Amino acid sequence: MKRGKCKEKDNGLKRISSESEVWNFLDVTVSELNKQKRSPGQTVSKRLHKKQRVVSNPDLSLPSSPVKQILRNGLQNSKYGSHKTGLERSASCSSIDASANHSSTTYREQRSYLMEEGLDTQPIVPREVSSGRELDSTNHTIGTERAFLIEEDVSEDDEIQMKSIHELRFAGEQQRIVDEIEYLVDGVTFSGNSSASRYLSLIGIAEKMFDNSFRLCLKSIRDVFLRIFEEIDPKDTLHTFLQIYIFATMANEMDCMSSLLDAYSNNVKLLLQTAITLEPQVPVSILAKSLPKSVKGAVQEFVIKAELTFSFSNESLASSDSISLAAIALMKTSSGVFAESELFTELINLLIEKSYPILKENDGSNNFLLHALCSSLEKFTDFQGSEKIQKVSQILSSKLQILIDEHNETNSPKIDDTVVHACSEKLLRTLIQTVNSNSDHALAVSKSEVPLFAYKILQKFSNFSSDDETTRELIILILGLLLGLVEESHEFIQTITHVEVSFGASALDVLISFYQKNESIVEISGYVVMILSHCFLNDPKAFAQLKPLISQFYESLHKFKNFHLKLKEELMMMGSNGLAIVSIIDELHKSLQDYLRSDLVK
């Protein structure tokens, strides 16, 4: 009997100990929750448990596995205790109430704080009945509050976290590119490196110049960019070529160009002068012929994939020589801050002089040089002397000759849209601008072969279709240049009746024939009439030949004026000031009108 009682007493003590551990666990849990709730700046689990959600199993909401085991043991002991006698249960309850009196008070205070209800007024339910329900209710309250805190923070924290991730990734990627740039530039500038290492470093930079991230980082560390041009070696042609390529790709970056000119304008001048004046000019692929195999392979791969020329040509850079690359570089800078410098003017005039012997040939080669030079000259008027105008005129004459030869071979009434055609248009625009701005330049153009080839183009393509935009645009530019010459030079007017374009046909004959075939095309016939009207009013020999056509000229000028008035209204609606040509048409129209009136009087 005594042993049985001792055993029962031992079981009761164990149960009391286990249940005490259960309630102590709850005290600790609720205290921890209150600490978290009293710290509004803290979030549940600090983003590390954002995906956590409340589950129905109370064990999963407990923070540590040892405590969970204690709770399980306590609950199991409670179950065993429910089968004991009433005396034993009474003794157990008395022992628990006595031993847990202090902790239960704290627990009530904690619960009343969490649930915001007057739980102090509720009667204490016996443990056997209340333990399961109260434990479930408490865990549910804890889980609900935890879920509320998580849901409240998850959207804001997700956004902040994603932003932080992107910023960190971008910063890391940016730093990686900056490190790469500095490494490559160090490879170029470090005196201890071999020439092969410097070439490979320059190629590494040049290959990535069309990578937006690379360019942005290179712009952001401008002092590193400038180091590429610290040293120029005129004798090292490949090194010079690669430096010019990098210069050309950054030509439209105004800030970089300004800094480069401020720091190393003499180096830039030496760099481009070296490329323009190099003799003999050879393709870049040949420059690496005698270099180590690694450099040779890298150069060949680079010039095939280089993107610099793809914006205006389908050809790779492999066939380009140094002067062509220098011309491309000047073309790229022709609309930026570099074009406003005296250095640009000096280099363009040097380029005209050195490219003239190459481009006057009609072999169809050096398209890069032709396109780049013509594009650079399209808005260029600061020619240093009439000699440069004569050379530009000679280049244009050679290209117009190519168009005529192609027509003779195919007998086609239209001009194909080729590099030669496009460059001829650019050169015509250049000469129109310079003729209208400088009478000396007008005289230089009038004495060149350009007018003769212009008449030949009008003769060969007099039957062109009005729908042929390519031929139409070229003809309008030719007529515009001839009109500028007759307005600026009376000597040129005298030549129109004398110069022989083909056997038995003078320039005046060609112009009259062209007018009669294209009278219905107002904007074409109008320019021809303006040229012929100047001849009629200023050359007695032309007067006799043109007199029968004056009435037609008068009507054509009237239509031409109305055409431009309508165009003027459209331009003024878009904010333009109108067209100066209208006043010129008015003067000629009035002069013809005066002649017709005087002729009627006679």
UniProtKB/Swiss-Prot annotation:
Polar residues compositional bias, start-end: 54-66
Region called Disordered, residue ranges: 34-66
Subcellular location: Nucleus; Chromosome
MF terms in GO: ATP hydrolysis activity; ATP-dependent protein binding; cohesin unloader activity; DNA binding
Top-rank taxon: Eukaryota
Entries under InterPro entries matching the protein: ARM-like, WAPL, WAPL_C
One GO cellular component term: nucleus
Keyword Manganese: no
Gene Ontology process terms (BP): cell division; chromatin looping; homologous chromosome pairing at meiosis; mitotic sister chromatid cohesion
Span of domain WAPL: 160-492
Presence of keyword GTP-binding: no
Keyword annotations of the record: Cell cycle, Cell division, Chromosome, Mitosis, Nucleus
Family per record: Belongs to the WAPL family.
Protein task: Regulator of sister chromatid cohesion in mitosis which negatively regulates cohesin association with chromatin.
Name of this protein: Wings apart-like protein homolog 1
Native source species: Schizosaccharomyces pombe (strain 972 / ATCC 24843) (Fission yeast)
Gene: wpl1
